[in-house]
Amino acid sequence: MKISIKTVFLTALAILVIAQPVFAQENETTEHKHYQFTLEDCIRFAFANSYDRKSMELNTESQQVSYDQSRESRMPSVSASASENFSNNKNGSSFSGNANLGAAVVIYQGGNINKTIEQNRLSLERSNMQLQQYDDQLSVQILQSFLTALGYNELLHYQEVMLKSSREQMKQGRTRYKVGSILESDMLLLEAQYISDSSNIVETRIKLDNSILSLKVLLSMDPLDNLQIIQPNTDNLDDLAASLPTEEYAIEMAMETYPTLKLSQYDILLAENNISMAKTGYKPSITANASIGTGHIDFDNLGQQFSDRFSQSAGISLNIPIYSRGQTKASVKRSKIALEQAQLDYEQTQFDVRQTVSVAYHNVVSAYNSYKASELKENAYSKSYNAYEVQFQYGKITTVDLLQQQNNYLNVLNDFIQNKYSLVLQRKVLDIYMGKEITL
């Protein structure tokens, strides 16, 4: 059978038309999102998408359910039942039925119900504080990763400027070598410096990409999504030092708001409540109950039967614990030991928090001093390097002198950038200890 070229063409065209939606769908599935985030955006995104945080939120919801249910335990319980039976024997067959409605309520249980409600309320508040603690820890991790990426991004900018300068120096060196004004070794040094600067840029880009990837992990973001961080204004960091409170005030604020300390306080309250709950085992309990019911045998005069068989009952019961084989006594002792342990942990936590905040405070002071020293040094080396560039253009200094000054400037610049973002990190960490939100 002979197939025309036109038939082949139309068949191929039809296949392409049919396949186009499939290709489009595949393209849609491979598209990735693009984000431009400030630090605050990163923190909000992480709070909304962190799987660990969602798990903690579910635990808090479960605690809320337990608390709500325990409050309902003050109410009476009500139940109803109904049955219908059929029997058959040599004397004949018969039907019988019963219906009952009953209620029971705890009148007194040694305060156990109220203590259980209080226990669940404290557990709920503690769960919320655990969530706050997690948020603070996650915020610090995001801050550190974000600032690391900013540092590499800023360093990359300066390195690209230096690479442009190295490129011009290399071109000038080749020109001057051709006319015999410099040695071949000097020209090769300039070319080697250009290659070295290019390599530094590649390494910094790799470090920047890795820091962005680490940030994506903290944000629970798809690693294939595109994330660009927005550079905040960091031109004048003196305000960070100007707004620094006294060390005593920083410690005082941390003692009032720090989640780890709050959790220790809740542990003490829970332990105290556990003692009260354990002691209820010594006390009697009183419950009351009431019920109504009716029934029938066969279906003759059904209404009259319901009336005749209608019954009511009510009662009250008293349960007095006499001897529980030492279980209640042991429970009280264990609860008291747990309270002593909670109080000891609280004292240790107080000490740790004071030490931690004090160290954080002095880290800020040290970071600021390092930043100011490196800022002055960077300004001096920048001016010196610019002067060396001009002198090199006029042939007043050697290539070795120029490259030595350039490398010195790059080292000083790298220290300046590290000290700059270290100051921001240390200051914001102190803010978190003091219960403040992170902003840049």
Where does each model-flagged region fall?
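Bacterial Sec-pathway N-terminal export signals of envelope proteins
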Residues: 24-79, 223, 229-269, 438
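Acidic, low-complexity, intrinsically disordered peripheral segments
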Residues: 2-6, 25-32, 40, 223, ...
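Extended amphipathic coiled-coil alpha-helical segments
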Residues: 54-73, 114-175, 192-199, 206, ...
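A short glycine-centered flexible hinge/capping loop motif at secondary-structure junctions
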Residues: 177-181, 392-396, 433
